[in-house]
């Protein structure tokens, strides 16, 4: 009898653990029908872990002028299927190394796709080919050697939509793109590929699978429509001028949903993006962004003294460049989480309070110019919060970058803040 009771208890415990595991693993899984079932209702969401920080402020997007109205309206139409003309909503998140790693943006992407539909992986960058860290859920490989240029070190190689550019002097070059998600096979399959390259100087071919349509509506990109969904494609580039330049790719599957594109460059500042040519901003405009999220400021705080006037000017120039090329987009500024200070080439155990000064300048610009902002600096606990984040093991050893869990938590917080704004819109307008 006692043995049977033990077996029964173990069985129940196993079932409970299995249910919890399935629930957690399915948290970001897209059910193509689920996101339309409560189309005009608010969305209930909260981060998977509720970290407590002593001086944290409410997790909201400050939008006193209701600037996000158009973006939120499109989200509501997308979710309700009430407007057939709105098939996709496009978000472009621009930043530094915190964005390049894609744990932050990757989490926000998964959540947006879960609740509003998954139209594909969107923009991807060939970072590995320049020996830098890659984004999530894709691999780009090539048998050729590529020289590179990026916004911190431009050298004449054209810099494109991803903030970098690759170039080879060979007559031909090959690229393989593979999308991967071990948790959810097929999640990022695609049947449409856009290659960002100089199509005036380069012929582009897809070796497999079969192509049913080719589109060259822009001078800087070529789009291929495939006859089937796939997670693997080989692309061949041929140039009679022995100069092949590429900057990135765009993957989609033809379904409704939110594209969540990320553009991140390690070490980037506002001023680096301002040095980009007009082509960079034109190519961003080709993504038809409904919302641009700007997450910079960490590297601006890694200096001996902050020039407040210059930083304000850099922020203003960047905002102008985005709005000038994409006049119909909404823009959100975010503030950086406090990090630890540098001591020479090493990181000290002292919080870098200059991050707070950068935060103040970003917020000052946003408030004066009517831009919404997400004040992650204070949402994360404000001045001194670095010590709490470090105790919770949310920083890696350099105490400037976060652990994967730390970035995922930021992504959950950002999505929660967007959903709060979305729910306010729904209550006021539906």
Description of each model-found segment:
Residues 27-28, 277, 339-430:
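Catalytic His-Asp segment of secreted/periplasmic serine-dependent ester chemistry enzymes
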Residues 1-38, 42, 421, 427-430:
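Bacterial Sec-dependent N-terminal signal peptides
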Residues 100-201, 205-208, 215-313, 401:
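Conserved SGNH/GDSL esterase-like catalytic core that processes O-acyl groups on lipids
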Residues 43-93, 155-164:
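Membrane/wall-proximal cationic-aromatic binding patches
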Residues 74-77, 282-283, 321, 417:
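A generic secondary-structure signal
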Residues 95, 197-199, 335:
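Short beta-strand/turn micro-motifs composed of small residues
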